[in-house]
């Protein structure tokens, strides 16, 4: 991702949703300093998110700014079982839309993050993963 503001080491992340999905609002957010657009895939449809990504990229291009796309993957608070079954469609969406970052919440072990990385590698993607640590147990090595 290209630096959008010289000498800035902090990035402003804005969560976009129904109230902030118009080109006009996105233009205001970008002009106000938004560096990364966060889309929470827990809400809305993949088609709605696809359209929003197109709008963000179009407005960013008009303003000659580079804006990152962060896709926050949905997940249950009690994540167990097959990671591939939980994330496959959303990871494919992230890869096909060239997301700049993927966020994971409610991860219960380092192994789950490794599995997501393995799935991304299979898809020939190296999208950075941001993990939200909910419990101390999640930090334990697997």
Predicted ranges, named:
Residues 1-142:
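Non-catalytic helical/linker scaffolds that mediate oligomerization, partner binding
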């Amino acid at each position: 991702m290209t630096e959008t503001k010289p000498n800035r080491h902090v990035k402003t992340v804005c969560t976009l949703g129904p109230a902030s999905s118009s080109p006009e609002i996105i233009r205001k957010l970008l002009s106000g300093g938004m560096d990364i657009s966060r889309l929470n895939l827990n809400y809305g449809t993949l088609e709605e998110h696809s359209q929003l990504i197109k709008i963000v990229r179009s407005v960013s291009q008009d303003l000659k700014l580079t804006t990152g796309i962060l896709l926050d993957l949905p997940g249950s608070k009690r994540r167990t079982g097959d990671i591939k079954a939980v994330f496959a469609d959303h990871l494919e969406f992230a890869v096909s839309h060239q997301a700049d970052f993927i966020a994971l919440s409610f991860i219960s072990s380092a192994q789950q993050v490794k599995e997501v990385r393995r799935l991304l590698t299979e898809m020939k993607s190296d999208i950075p993963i941001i993990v939200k640590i909910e419990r101390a147990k999640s930090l334990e090595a697997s």
